[in-house]
């Protein structure tokens, strides 16, 4: 028996990365998992180096970032890798979720895999928000103020929670210091959740585009899918490098190059682009508590999909109506992202409310109705064929 199978530790690596049997039909959308793993490694590595030079004191936070940019050897590179790495992390994550929605990866027997994935998504957004606050530019300060203030909408205890999180009566030194401590700690918890995600995946294996069991035809992970993953890794690194070296501030906000000033409010307060769809949902509800519930509900409603999708066939590869509904949902989500960065004025308010209503309707009405209708059509088709 080879050492990779007999050794206790190497056998674990072997079962995940070498001999792991994968369905032969999986396409390039299945490469996003390895890209997300790469993003996490890049973020943790660059973050550790940034933490060596960053000061979490509110008086020094902005200046310490400028010190990293100007005085630390290759500090500009580490900072831009970390800042753009966050954006690329979310690009890959949204594509990964989109793949799961399209191919029905959330259906039985992979519900636990899906639940852990949603928890990872929520934790990643929390980590990204706290990291954005640490720069302590104008948008960091006001973004932190607005988002943390949302907790004041919680009945009875909300007004006590907000100063508890701030450590004072506004976003101040204790806020930035505790955000820094959590921003450093939580990625390691995220890495543990990723390991749990892989363990849950390992129980039943990957799904596939066809939507049937992959046991009919499987191939070992190495060398076939390792080399297939390497193709997208190199493409990812090429595009990532283009942003880091040639357009590092495109995905950021120019106001964050102005030191945070509690006395000057920016014309519009917007979070980073990857949080904009949920920010648009928050703003589209006039009531504060209703907006907060809608925003968190928009994320947690992902957990309902294994139960609201009644289809007997996994995935949308052979389902015309489900494909149409999926592409409408994607368009609506992109529309919400655009609305989140626009001023709250006449055409955008109503448009945001319609987009929010459709977002929830997709999960609650569209998916159950279309999946049931397609089941009926499938049954009629099979009965006709039998006759």
From Swiss-Prot:
Binding-site positions, heme b b562: 82, 183
One Pfam assignment: Cytochrom_B_C
Any one GO cellular component localisation term in the record: respiratory chain complex III
InterPro entries, per the entry: Cyt_b/b6_C (IPR005798), Cyt_b/b6_C_sf (IPR036150), Cyt_b/b6_N (IPR005797), Cytb/b6-like_sf (IPR027387), Cytochrome_b (IPR030689), Cytochrome_b_C_euk/bac (IPR048260), Cytochrome_b_N_euk/bac (IPR048259), Di-haem_cyt_TM (IPR016174)
The UniProt record lists the keyword rRNA-binding: no
Phenotype of null mutants: Leads to lethality, showing that it is an essential gene.
Subunit structure, as described in the record: Component of the ubiquinol-cytochrome c oxidoreductase (cytochrome b-c1 complex, complex III, CIII), a multisubunit enzyme composed of 10 subunits. The complex is composed of 3 respiratory subunits cytochrome b (COB), cytochrome c1 (CYT1) and Rieske protein (RIP1), 2 core protein subunits COR1 and QCR2, and 5 low-molecular weight protein subunits QCR6, QCR7, QCR8, QCR9 and QCR10.
Miscellaneous remark of the record: Heme 1 (or BL or b562) is low-potential and absorbs at about 562 nm, and heme 2 (or BH or b566) is high-potential and absorbs at about 566 nm.
The protein's name: Cytochrome b
Source organism per UniProt: Candida albicans (strain SC5314 / ATCC MYA-2876) (Yeast)
């Amino acid at each position: 028996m080879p050492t990779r199978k007999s050794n206790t530790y190497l056998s674990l690596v072997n079962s995940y990365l070498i001999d792991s049997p994968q369905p032969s039909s999986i396409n390039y959308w299945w490469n996003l998992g390895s890209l997300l793993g790469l993003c996490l490694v890049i973020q943790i590595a660059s973050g550790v180096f940034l933490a060596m030079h960053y000061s979490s004191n509110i008086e020094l936070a902005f200046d310490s970032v400028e010190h990293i940019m100007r005085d630390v050897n290759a500090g500009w590179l580490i900072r831009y890798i970390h800042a753009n790495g966050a954006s690329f992390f979310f690009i890959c994550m949204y594509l990964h979720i989109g793949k799961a929605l399209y191919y029905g990866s959330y259906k039985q027997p992979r519900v636990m895999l899906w639940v852990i994935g949603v928890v990872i998504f929520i934790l990643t957004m929390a980590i990204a928000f706290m990291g954005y606050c640490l720069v302590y530019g104008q948008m960091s300060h006001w973004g932190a103020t607005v988002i943390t203030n949302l907790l004041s909408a919680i009945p009875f205890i909300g007004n006590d929670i907000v100063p508890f999180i701030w450590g004072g009566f506004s976003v101040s030194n204790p806020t930035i210091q505790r955000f820094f401590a959590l921003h450093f700690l939580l990625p390691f918890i995220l890495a543990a959740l990723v390991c749990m995600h892989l363990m849950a995946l390992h129980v039943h294996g990957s799904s596939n585009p066809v939507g049937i069991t992959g046991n009919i035809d499987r191939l070992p992970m190495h060398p076939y899918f390792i080399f297939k993953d390497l193709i997208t890794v190199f493409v990812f690194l090429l595009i990532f490098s283009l942003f880091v070296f040639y357009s590092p501030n495109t995905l950021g906000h120019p106001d964050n190059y102005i030191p945070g000033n509690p006395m000057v409010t920016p014309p519009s307060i917007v979070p980073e682009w990857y949080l904009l769809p949920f920010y648009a949902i928050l703003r589209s509800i006039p009531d504060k508590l209703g907006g907060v519930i809608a925003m968190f509900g928009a994320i947690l409603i992902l957990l309902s999909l294994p139960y609201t999708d009644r289809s007997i066939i996994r995935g949308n590869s052979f389902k015309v109506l489900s494909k149409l509904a999926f592409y409408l949902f994607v368009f609506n989500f992109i529309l919400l992202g655009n609305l989140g960065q626009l001023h709250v004025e006449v055409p955008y308010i109503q448009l945001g409310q319609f987009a929010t209503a459709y977002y929830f309707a997709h999960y609650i009405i569209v998916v159950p109705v279309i999946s049931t209708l397609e089941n009926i059509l499938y049954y009629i088709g099979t009965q006709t064929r039998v006759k």
